[in-house]
């Protein structure tokens, strides 16, 4: 059985340790099941694929009406999370974790937690969401190198899109554009054991 554990750094973010099964033909692995999160009544509405060259950084992005579930199908990325929910007990904490071929983790990101990733190699990220893409109303950004947040990307010179390069620092974003609540994801039922993330789970 796959195991799931809530982040010790950001409340409501979850990491699923995935377990492949292989034989002489190859291997098989479940990467997502709705019943891994049995207390969440959600509808999966869209699945996306993002291909990135090594050195590309995408983010930081956040949503008011969408949760994400990430799985890296090729290569390795360093995922970065920032809790932007004012009423959260982990407000403004940050976390990075390396996920991909050599650390096969599914990453659940709740509403109000900013997220992004640095491609450590050429990489493919697949992710499912519970709302349709809405570029006008629910695609928001914060500067990847915000000095008040200090996300540990491990680089000072990533490849950025023009849009991400123009993202503002958190202190310069109007309060009405930031998440207001704590989010809407309860703890899962106690069906799963803890997982060991290893040295990639690092910064507060």
Which positions does each model-derived feature cover?
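Non-catalytic, conserved peripheral segments adjacent to functional cores
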Residues: 1-105, 123-127, 134-204
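Short beta-strand His + acidic residue motifs that chelate non-heme Fe in jelly-roll/DSBH
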Residues: 107, 115-120
């Amino acid at each position: 059985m796959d195991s799931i554990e809530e982040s010790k750094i950001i409340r409501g973010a979850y990491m699923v340790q995935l377990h492949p099964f292989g034989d002489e033909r190859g291997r098989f692995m479940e990467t997502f099941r709705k019943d891994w999160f049995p207390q969440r009544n959600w509808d999966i509405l869209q699945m996306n694929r993002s291909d990135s060259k090594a050195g590309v950084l995408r983010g930081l992005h956040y949503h008011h009406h969408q949760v994400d579930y990430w799985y890296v199908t090729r290569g390795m990325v360093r995922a970065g999370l920032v809790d932007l929910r004012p009423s959260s007990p982990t407000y403004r904490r940050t976390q990075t974790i390396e996920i991909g071929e050599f650390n096969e983790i599914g990453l659940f990101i709740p509403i109000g937690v900013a997220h992004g990733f640095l491609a450590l190699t050429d990489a493919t990220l697949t992710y499912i969401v519970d709302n349709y893409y809405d570029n006008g109303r629910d695609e928001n950004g914060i500067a990847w190198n915000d000095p008040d947040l200090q996300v540990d990307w491990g680089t000072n010179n990533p490849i950025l899109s023009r849009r991400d390069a123009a993202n503002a620092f958190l202190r310069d974003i109007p309060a009405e554009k930031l998440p207001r609540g704590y989010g809407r994801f309860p703890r899962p039922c106690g069906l799963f054991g803890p997982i060991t993330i290893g040295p990639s789970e690092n910064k507060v």
